[in-house]
Amino acid sequence: MKSHTQSLLAESLNALKQQGVVPADFEARIQVDRTKDKSHGDFATNLAMMLTKAARKNPREIAQLIIDNLPQSSHVEKVEIAGPGFINFFIDDNALANQLMDALNSDHLGVTLPESQTVVVDYSSPNLAKEMHVGHLRSTIIGDSVVRSLEFMGHNVIRQNHVGDWGTQFGMLLAYMEELRAANGEQAQIELSDLENFYRAAKVRFDESEDFANRARKLVVALQSGDEYCNKLWREFNDISLSHCHEIYERLGVSLTRQDVRGESSYNDDLEQVVADLDSQGLLSESNGAKVVFQEEFKNKEGEPLPVIIQKADGGYLYATSDMAAMRYRSNVLKADRALYFVDLRQALHFQQVFKLAKTAKFVREEMSFEHMGFGTMNGEDGRPFKTRSGGVVKLIDLLKEADTRALELVRSKNPDMDEAELAEIARVVGIASVKYADLSKNRTSDYIFSFEQMLSFEGNTAPYLLYAYTRVAGIFKRAQDVDLSDAKIVLEHEKEKDLGTKLAQFGEVMNRVVNKGQPHALCAYLFELAGAFSSFYEACPVLAADTEAQKKSRLLLAQLTAKTLKQGLNLLGLETLERM
C-alpha cells in the first residue's frame, strides 16, 4: 500500500508538471510515512510543502491541487488535508483485506520484491588461533540476520567470513610450537583448548624475549615465503581454530559454512600489486620509511592529513592493504552491487579511508556501494565492556552454556512435570534465542547492557515473550483443526481486526528497512508490536466463539497470517520457533 500511495502521488506530480503548476525539471523524492494516529489515516506525505517554493503557492493550496490530480484508486477510501499542508490517505478496508489474503497465499507474505542485486556481506570474521569471545557476537548475529533478510527479499548474497588467518600471531605460535616440540618431541599434540594457552604463552615469550620475538618474525617471513613446514603447521592451527568457530556457528544457528571463509591470506598474492598500482598512479608517499596515502578529506585535530598506511618500513602489509585487495576482488571478480561490512563502529575512520581510496584508485567499479554497518559494544551491568568476574574476556561458548543453564531453570520452573528431554530442547531454543534477540532488538549503532535476567523475561520485548506469542497463536489452530478454511475470506469489521490487519500489512515496509539500512532491530520492534496487536485483537474479538461461521473463519485467517508472519520474522532473525512452551 505504501508503494501504491507513492505511485499515485508521482502521477499527480507529473500532471502538475504538464499543467505548468510545477516546473518540468523539478525533482522531488516523494516521502510517504505511516501515521501514528489512526484518526489521521494510514499514510501521510509532506509533498505539498516540498512544492511550495517551486509552485509559488501556499502548501494547502498545492495540497488540494495534488489531491485533484490523483488517479482514481479502489485502494484509497478518502484523502484529506491536515495542518499546514500534510496530505493524509485513508486505505479502504476491503483493499486491505484483499492485500492480507494475497499475503496469506504468498511465499513471501505478499512482499513486493525489489530488483535482485548481488550483495557481499562481510561478517563474523574472527582472528584465528584464539577462541571466539563475546566481542564476536554482534558481527556474527547481526550480519547473519541481514543475510537471511537479503535472501528473503530475492537478492543473491555472497557470505564472506574474512577471518584473521595471517600475521604476527602465527609467527608467535610457530615459534612457541618449535619450543614445545623441542621439549616434548615432534608429536606434541595441538588440541582445541590449547590454542588459547599457546597464544597466551607465546605472547608472554614474545614480549619478554627479544630472541623469541626475532624468531617469530623470521617465521612469519618464512610462512609468507611458502616454507613447507611453516605452512603445514599454519594450516593445522587454522583447521583447529575454524572447527571451533563452526561449532559456535552451529550452536548459534548461524548460516556461515567453511565455504564462506575467505581469510586475509587469500589476498597475499595481490598485496604487492596493490602497492604497485597505487604507486603507478602517484598516490603513494613515504613517511618514516613507510608507504602511505594522504587524502585531503581526512585530517587530524591539528588539520594535518591522516595517512592510510599501505606498507610498513620493514615491508609488512597492514589491514588497509588486504582490505583494498578484498574490495578489488569483490568488485571485479564477484561483480557485487553492494558490499556490507559488519565491523565495530570504532573502525569507522578506517573504512571511510579505504572506501574512498579504492574509488580514487579505480580499484572498484564506480557504481558499486561499499557500506560499513558499524555496531556498538556489549557491556556488563556496570556499563563497562562485558568481562568475567576476574576481569578477563568472556568466551562465547561459556556465555552460550550459561544461557542454556539459565533457560533450563526457567523452563523447568514453568513446566515441572515436563519430560526432561523436551525440557532440554525447549531450553536450548529459548537460551540461544534470548541471547540473540537481546542483541538484535537494540539499534546496532548503540552500546547495550547484557543482562540474563532481562533477556529471559516473559515480559517486554524479549525472545521468550515472542516465542510464547507464537505458540499461543499456533495453539488456536490445534483447537480448530476441523474448520474448513478453503472458502474463507478476511473481512475487517471490528476496530481491533483493522488494527491487526494494518500491522500485518506493514511487514514489507519493515523488511525494506532491514535490507537497505542493515537494521534488524526494526524487525524486532515490528514483531513485538504485531504480537501486541494480536493480543489486543484476541481479547476483543472471540475467534472460535465468534458470532457467525464466516466471522470465525475470517478471524482464523487473521490468526494464521499472524502466525506465519511471526514465524517468518523470527526465522529471519535466526531464531527457531516452538510449538509448545
Swiss-Prot record:
This is Arginine--tRNA ligase. Belongs to the class-I aminoacyl-tRNA synthetase family. The keyword ATP-binding applies. A motif ('HIGH' region) lies at residues 126-136. It comes from the Bacteria. It is found in: Cytoplasm. SMART domains: Arg_tRNA_synt_N, DALR_1. It comes from Shewanella piezotolerans (strain WP3 / JCM 13877). Monomer. The gene is argS. GO terms for molecular function: arginine-tRNA ligase activity; ATP binding. Keywords: Aminoacyl-tRNA synthetase, ATP-binding, Cytoplasm, Ligase, Nucleotide-binding, Protein biosynthesis. It is an enzyme of class 6 (ligase). One of its GO terms (biological process) is arginyl-tRNA aminoacylation. The keyword Transcription regulation does not apply. InterPro entries: aa-tRNA-synth_I_CS, Arg-tRNA-ligase, Arg-tRNA-synth_N, Arg-tRNA-synth_N_sf, ArgRS_core, DALR_anticod-bd, Rossmann-like_a/b/a_fold, tRNAsynth_Ia_anticodon-bd. The lineage of its organism: Bacteria, Pseudomonadati, Pseudomonadota, Gammaproteobacteria, Alteromonadales. GO terms for cellular component: cytoplasm.
